[in-house]
Amino acid sequence: MIKSQKEYLERIEYLNTLSHHYYNLDESIVSDAVYDELYQELKAYEEKNPNDIQANSPTQKVGATTTTPFSKNPHLMRMWSLDDVFNQSELQAWLQRILKVYPNASFVCSPKLDGVSLNLLYHHGKLVSATTRGNGLEGELVTNNAKHIANIPHFIAYDGEIEIRGEVIISKEDFEALNKERLEANEPLFANPRNAASGSLRQLDSEITKKRKLQFIPWGVGKHSLNFLSFKECLDFIVSLGFGAIQYLSLNKNHQEIEESYHTLIKEREGFFALLDGMVIVVNELGIQKELGYTQKSPKFACAYKFPALEKHTKIIGVINQVGRSGAITPVALLEPVEIAGAMVNRATLHNYSEIEKKNIMLNDRVVVIRSGDVIPKIIKPLETYRDGSQHKIERPKVCPICSHELLCEEIFTYCQNLNCPARLKESLIHFASKDALNIQGLGDKVIEQLFEEKLIVNALDLYALKLEDLMRLDKFKIKKAQNLLDAIQKSKNPPLWRLINALGIEHIGKGASKTLARYGLNVLEKSEAEFLEMEGFGVEMAHSLVNFYASNQEFIRSLFDLLNPKNSDMAKEKQKSSSVFNNKTIVLTGTLSKPRQEYAQMLENLGAKISSSVSAKTDFLIVGENPGSKLALAKKHGVSVLNEEELLKRLKELD
């Protein structure tokens, strides 16, 4: 709570410093939740003391002034910031201000993506500039980098001048992969997907941007000459131009419907492909929007209904070391319990000891913890201003916490090299039975631990020798449960080849790489390092890991393959793919089809096609359903082959 004008001025200075770090340096000094709390206190003081309001207050401006090597570029129409609401009562108050004057107003609700706002300017159908939000009036010109974002069309079927606005994001999956690469290269990790997206969009080298797998999700328009009556019509028009559709978009009439949409999003939040921090609510009727107008900073016809925070501050009270299936030691921080988005968090990964030293994290530190989707909670950084002298250095272990074998300490990672370490064996089997490997139902972590304790198994081969009486020795196992597990183990025989390769737990070889390897047949693991390097997406580390793993485990691998007899259906699929007319072709689907577009997209991808959301001169086929819209005209302009649904089905049938 701000009690004086002096505290008010200090708060402005502090919040402006935070904004500068957030917008210009891609660095979050405090969590979003802490910033929101400080901002709301500032706003409350200004509401009580309007004569004290300063022009440089963050409530009076959008974003931050840019201070980067990129040139500044003005927006044709201002990019506004949204006012936040944090609970039902605040939302109700916001709605009442609108509905008491416009009782028939409706509201478009959509996910609030946590990324970087970008303004795309098209003139006569051509992308002429891409500018970040900046201070709302002008931002950074990042056109060359934006052109490397795969789902931003360089041309659209609209001749007028139009600003299309949206969010540049990186998916949670791609964010984790990017940070894994940086970790292995001993580079600083990105704190969160938003920082990764911002840093990637603002690279001086566009080739780096191209590699980062950024995505653009549209959410509105700036200057335009469209004649639509509703905001939803505008969004539908943007999608028809070749931009990706907005997931979980809904049109609502009242508070109850908006709350239902909000809670649906919260429910889907963890499984959503990108990081969300709320729901955007916009008055649908453009005439009402115009009459409502703007405050100095925000539109009165829209707000952001924020989600509960996924970042919190807590204290490290201890550190334990876990041993992975490769022998890598992972330090895990024990935390004072803290609730993050409805889940109680009492531990978080510290990645490795090199990362601990780089971030200068100490025992008894107060730290920022983040939890994103299904990702294990992690510590972003220490809050050094809270240090009181009780902190201690977190020391690297010298022996394995499980088998007491001496550890190998490399520059980044620390390893237990004892191949018979129980932790390594146990973790290998947990992975072997996991969903993306052999997916053995009922064979979870606790069951595997019991099997080890009873000395019933040492490796994966032992699973297939288990008998009913063996399982009956385990805690909480009766005849039916034991028989079900035996049946599930037997059912895991004859798996797809890629699943068995993935189940081996080879370092640097995940699900995607396993599928690539499976294309080369049952003897793929016997290939040389040079042959592995010729495979798409395989680097030196992966090739080296494969060769070393096979050399060390030849007998075990052969025995496992003989016992499980994996199916080599991947080879047949590759043969079908190579003979397909759609192999290596870029395809766009548009209009209403009898099956969901995603179903057709999956069929075509299985035949080697690349699915795109926008038509260009590089498009090979346009698949059209009913009401194809502007994409059909654009396809004819570029000489793209057009197939209707009947023709597509005929060609697919010919390939069976």
Curated annotation (Swiss-Prot):
Gene designation: ligA
Active site (record annotation): 112
Ranges of residues in domain BRCT: 577-656
Organism listed in the record: Helicobacter pylori (strain P12)
Entry keyword annotation includes NAD: yes
Record's GO cellular component terms: cytosol
InterPro entries in the record: BRCT_dom, BRCT_dom_sf, DNA_ligase, DNA_ligase_AS, DNA_ligase_CS, DNAligase_adenylation, DNAligase_N, Hlx-hairpin-Hlx_DNA-bd_motif
PANTHER family named among the record's database cross-references: CHROMOSOME TRANSMISSION FIDELITY FACTOR 18, DNA LIGASE
Function: DNA ligase that catalyzes the formation of phosphodiester linkages between 5'-phosphoryl and 3'-hydroxyl groups in double-stranded DNA using NAD as a coenzyme and as the energy source for the reaction. It is essential for DNA replication and repair of damaged DNA.
Enzyme class, UniProt record, top EC level: ligase
EC number(s) recorded for this UniProt protein: 6.5.1.2
Entry's family note: Belongs to the NAD-dependent DNA ligase family. LigA subfamily.
A Pfam entry, by short name: DNA_ligase_OB
SUPFAM superfamilies noted in UniProt: BRCT domain (SSF52113), DNA ligase/mRNA capping enzyme, catalytic domain (SSF56091), Nucleic acid-binding proteins (SSF50249), RuvA domain 2-like (SSF47781)
GO terms assigned for molecular function: DNA binding; DNA ligase (NAD+) activity; metal ion binding
Ligand binding (Zn(2+)): 400, 403, 416, 421
Keyword Manganese tagged: yes
Keywords: DNA damage, DNA repair, DNA replication, Ligase, Magnesium, Manganese, Metal-binding, NAD, Zinc
Residues that bind NAD(+): 32-36, 81-82, 133, 167, 306
Listed name of the protein: DNA ligase
